[in-house]
């Protein structure tokens, strides 16, 4: 048995694939220690893994909702005069970030880091005789070569993967193949998280009856994306669903979508709000389309179930993921600054809810389902442990 430390950063959606990896490695007899932000502690413990606090501030629903404007990068991307200010990482920042890892990695055999933690993981590798595996759960950066991105010089050495033979990309090549310069990266397929509460397979009777009616409902799921204007987003989508004669299930998520956001003139029998976790495989396999923010986990799960998507991106890798959806013709994407009920309804009608888009989503989903991302990752990791 080996002791493996996994360190991650980000919101819940960023952490769940790593929790899934930790569970898979534990079933193979390894001791797993996870260094995460405090907001995802409960998910780590629920998976039967050891949880340790990272140096990062808590990133939970309340924290991100309080700074929702920081999670909307579209205005900055559209600005004619880009902000050229570059962040500077100080020595103290690196020490602070690496200190929790130093304690947890003592006596461990391997450290697995997501890309946000690489700069701290590199410090650990210099201190301990420990195997290091780098990783990403989104193909952004490794999936293209024709887009120019400026990084602070300090980051460039950590972004470079050419000298890293132990780098795993937990995304499907059927969603985004690697560009040639990243051919050395091991692409395993997606790491799907399965919650123990999903083992029953079906949600409450109320949700089941709502979802299983015809025509199939739309699903609005922004997952851990916070919003400055959740009421406006809800109103646009319930009105769009009404125009299409569709019911809509809205997942509360970190935007805190709720009944108070509904306009008074909407038939509430055609709208349902869902709190907490729902078995996504059950839900998405019964949905007409999943409207989402472009998170890689939500898109992957939708396609796994042959469900086309409408992507409404706000920040980070979401724009790249939206582009891939359009390239694959498994759905489309919209400018989130131009969301209206008429436009959303039209995009859904013409570029999501058609037989061709459904057929393509099913085809891609079958390829994704044929992959065994977690098994492939565990096999790689164990081969590196023994080498």
Which stretches of residues belong to each language-model region?
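Short glycine-enriched loops at secondary-structure junctions
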Residues: 138, 254-255, 315-317
């Amino acid at each position: 048995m080996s002791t493996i430390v996994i360190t991650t950063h980000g919101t819940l959606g960023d952490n769940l694939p790593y929790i899934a990896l930790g569970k898979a490695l534990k079933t193979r007899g390894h001791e797993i220690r996870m260094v995460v932000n405090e907001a995802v502690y409960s998910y780590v413990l629920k998976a039967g893994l050891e949880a340790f606090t990272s140096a990062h501030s808590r990133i939970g629903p309340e924290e991100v909702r309080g700074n929702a404007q920081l999670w909307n990068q579209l205005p900055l991307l559209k600005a004619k005069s880009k902000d050229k200010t570059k962040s500077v990482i100080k020595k103290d920042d690196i020490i602070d970030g690496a200190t929790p890892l130093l304690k947890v990695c003592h006596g461990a055999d391997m450290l697995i880091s997501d890309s946000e933690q690489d700069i701290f993981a590199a410090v650990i590798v210099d201190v301990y005789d420990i195997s290091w595996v780098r990783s990403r759960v989104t193909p952004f950066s490794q999936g293209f070569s024709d887009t120019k991105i400026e990084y602070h010089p300090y980051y460039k050495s950590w972004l470079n993967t050419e000298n890293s033979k132990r780098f795993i990309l937990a995304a499907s090549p059927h969603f985004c193949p690697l560009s040639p310069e990243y051919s050395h990266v091991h692409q395993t397929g997606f790491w799907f998280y399965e919650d123990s509460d999903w083992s029953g397979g079906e949600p409450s009777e109320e949700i089941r009856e709502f979802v299983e009616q015809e025509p199939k409902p739309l699903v609005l799921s922004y997952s851990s994306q916070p919003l400055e204007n959740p009421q406006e987003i809800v109103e646009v989508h319930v009105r769009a669903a009404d125009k299409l004669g569709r019911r809509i299930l809205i997942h509360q998520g970190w935007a805190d979508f709720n009944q108070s956001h509904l306009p008074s003139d909407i038939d509430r029998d055609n709208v349902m709000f869902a709190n907490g976790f729902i078995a996504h495989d059950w839900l998405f396999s019964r949905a007409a389309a999943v409207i989402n923010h472009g998170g890689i986990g939500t898109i992957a799960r939708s396609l796994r179930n042959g469900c086309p998507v409408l992507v409404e991106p706000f920040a980070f890798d979401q724009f790249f993921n939206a582009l891939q959806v359009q390239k694959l013709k498994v759905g489309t994407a919209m400018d989130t600054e131009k969301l209206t009920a008429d436009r959303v309804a039209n995009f859904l009608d013409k570029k999501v809810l058609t037989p061709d888009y459904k057929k393509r989503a099913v085809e891609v989903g079958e390829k994704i389902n044929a992959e065994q991302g977690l098994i492939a990752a565990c096999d790689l990791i164990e081969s590196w442990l023994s080498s």
